[in-house]
Amino acid sequence: MAKTSAVEKNKRRRKLVANHAAKRAVLKAIIMNQSLPIEERFKATLKLAELPRDGSKTRIRNRCEVTGRPRAYYRKLRMSRIALRELGNLGKVPGVVKSSW
């Protein structure tokens, strides 16, 4: 199991991203718009820098829903390889069977 604090921190970051996503998108569009004057684009850059860092989507870490493990994460299943193996052996993941040939 991952540390509870790491899992909770990631949950907090996900909430911040959801809250600030629209504002970040607007500011980034202003910054990237070449037709606007440079002063206005610079002001948008400063406003973007004032937003919390954890509100950026790149700060989110994919973690296993079962264990909180950050590595060996399968996006489709939202769990790590270890949790997948354990639940697969118990027959709790539909369609997963032990291989034999």
UniProtKB/Swiss-Prot annotation:
GO molecular function annotation = rRNA binding; structural constituent of ribosome
> Which InterPro entries does this UniProt record tie to the protein?
Ribosomal_uS14 (IPR001209), Ribosomal_uS14_bac/plastid (IPR023036), Ribosomal_uS14_CS (IPR018271)
Q: Does the keyword Oxidoreductase apply?
A: no
- Record's GO cellular component terms: cytoplasm; small ribosomal subunit
Example GO biological process term?
A: translation
Q: Which UniProt keywords apply?
A: Ribonucleoprotein, Ribosomal protein, RNA-binding, rRNA-binding
> Which PROSITE patterns does the record associate with it?
RIBOSOMAL_S14
Give the protein family: Belongs to the universal ribosomal protein uS14 family.
Q: What is this protein for, i.e. what is its function?
A: Binds 16S rRNA, required for the assembly of 30S particles and may also be responsible for determining the conformation of the 16S rRNA at the A site.
Give the quaternary structure.
Answer: Part of the 30S ribosomal subunit. Contacts proteins S3 and S10.
Question: What is this protein called in UniProt?
Answer: Small ribosomal subunit protein uS14
Q: Give the species.
A: Rhizobium meliloti (strain 1021) (Ensifer meliloti)
What taxonomic ancestry is recorded?
Bacteria, Pseudomonadati, Pseudomonadota, Alphaproteobacteria, Hyphomicrobiales
